[in-house]
Structures are given as structure tokens and as C-alpha cells.
Amino acid sequence: MNTSVDGLSVDQVHVWRGDRHVLKGVSLTLRPRQLLHISGANGTGKTTLLRVVCGLLRPEQGLVSWLGQSISSVRAEYQAALAYASHEPALKGDLTALENLRFAVGLKRRVTAGELRASLEKTGVAGCADLPARVLSAGQRRRVALARILSMKASLWLLDEPFTNLDAAGTDLTGALLQSHVEGGGAALVVAHHDLKVDVDMRRLELGL
């Protein structure tokens, strides 16, 4: 069994969708100060794997563990430790950027408006704090979603295509924040189609081979 007592472990995970075997015995480990870059062609199960890892989808076979224990047995502790960003920013259009952060982050921990505004500042969208999400550009929404991840103060980041709709500056900023998170003792599992420009302990897993 592939189990890490100081991080995340995925051991021989299998997922089917109807007759299609989407994940075929996927295993991985991720420890503090590490980044795992997951790549692969469309339809190879990258998003499915992230959903399994964050506990949104139960695999037909296999085990996901956190600190040596099944995530189902330490659900509260695990959910407190992780921050998940899907491939869509998932913002409520009628709420402002700040309200979106307050709603999402408030489910995990107590947070002040000042902390949330600081996260928006770090991701370059402080000027959007009081604007409804529906008027923001795709790139701005992506930056707000990144601010949400920062605000959660989680040790484990699970990011699905975090560079989508970002310009060069936004891509560089996201890479820098990823590097800072990992260098600070965090861990990150990132689905991305292109190479990641970060100078950390980075592993790679390509699905569909």
C-alpha cells in the first residue's frame, strides 16, 4: 500500500463512468514542500482524479489517505486542510468579489474583510472587490478564485487548470504564489496543460499513458 504519514496518498484508485474505465489504478504521494503537476490529454481523468482527491467523488476501488488515514475517517480535519479550485472560478454573479470570498472562506474559518481584501490585493484585483462578479472579465474572475484559495490558509492546494484565461502577468503571478505556498511548507496538486514555471520540488504525473 502506498501510504504517506506526512501528506497525501492515493493508492490504486479506479473510477468507471458507465463502461469507460476513466482512472486505472492511479497512485501518487504528495508531501509538504512538494508540487505534483498532473497532465494528460482531454478525457484522461485529470478532473476526475482531483474530485476523488478532494472527496467529492468516491472511487470504485482504491484509497485516498491524509496523514496516514483514510480521508473518510478524518473528513473534518482533511477538509480544513485543503483548498480546491475547479476549472471554473465558480463565483456567484450577483455577489461582489469580496462577498464571494466571505461566503466561501467563511465556511472554513473566521475571516475579516481586511484579510480578504489583502488576498485580492495579492492577486491584483483589489479594485474589483466591490464589483459584482458578473461584470468581471474571465481573467479577473480567475484571479478572484485564486484570492479565495489564498484566504483559506490551507496547507494542501488542489487546482484544476488555474492558468486558464490569464494573461502573461496573471500566469507569472499564479506561478509565484504557487512557489511561495510550497516553499512555505504547503503542498499543491495542479492540473495544467502546459509546463509550470516554478522552482520547487515538482513531480509529474501524466494520465492516459
Protein language model features and the residues they cover:
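Q-loop/switch helix immediately C-terminal to the Walker
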Residues: 88, 93-109
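Conserved ABC transporter NBD signature motif
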Residues: 62-73, 77-78
